[in-house]
């Protein structure tokens, strides 16, 4: 990815993880004018849950410093909601539904949050950047081929990312 591509506004960025550190990253990227989608597990565990977008998994939405993350149903739930059976047409219809739901949340100035622990949806969205902010001590499925730029945050992200950032907590960061 060239410097001009990185500098442009409105990049589509997927952040794997929505814990307290990931929330800070998401918040800053959103304020910089980028479209950010957060991916989280079914039962997230964050150190500081009251300042974490992962709370949206439990409450449907979470607001941190004026920015709201909104939980969207998983793709399978979208198929159930629309009453469509498991056919190729159903998959296309549910993907259109998912894209329109995500676009509606983004247009509202919020962050869509999807439950996708394996990152399967990343290939569907074809983001400009993937940020692995899961903060696990091992790789949980992120690969360098997921986007033109893949950034790892925390331990264990050296071999599968273009860039790596060390995490630090505190208000002087």
Describe these PLM feature segments.
Residues 114-154:
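N-terminal glycine-rich phosphate/adenylate-binding segment common to multiple enzyme folds
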Residues 14-23:
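Glycine-rich adenosine-cofactor-binding loop
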Residues 161-168:
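Conserved small/polar residues in nucleotide/adenosyl-binding loops
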Residues 44-65:
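N-terminal beta-loop-helix "entrance" segment that forms/cooperates
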Residues 30:
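Gly/Ala-rich phosphate-binding loop of Rossmann-like dinucleotide-binding domains
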């Amino acid at each position: 990815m060239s410097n001009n591509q990185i500098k442009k506004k409105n990049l589509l960025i997927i952040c794997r993880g929505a814990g307290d550190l990931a929330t800070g990253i998401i918040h800053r990227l959103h304020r910089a004018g980028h479209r950010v989608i957060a991916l989280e597990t079914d039962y997230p565990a964050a150190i500081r849950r009251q300042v974490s977008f992962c709370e949206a998994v439990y409450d449907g939405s979470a607001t941190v410093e004026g920015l709201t993350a909104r939980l969207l149903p998983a793709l399978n739930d979208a198929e159930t909601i629309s009453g469509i059976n498991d056919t190729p047409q159903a998959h296309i219809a549910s993907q259109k539904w998912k894209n329109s739901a995500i676009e509606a949340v983004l247009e509202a100035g919020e962050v869509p949050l999807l439950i996708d622990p394996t990152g399967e949806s990343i290939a569907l969205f074809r983001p400009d950047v993937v940020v692995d902010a899961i903060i696990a001590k091992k790789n949980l499925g992120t690969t360098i081929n997921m986007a033109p730029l893949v950034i790892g945050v925390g331990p264990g992200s050296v071999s599968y990312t273009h860039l790596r950032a060390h995490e630090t907590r505190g208000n002087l960061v």
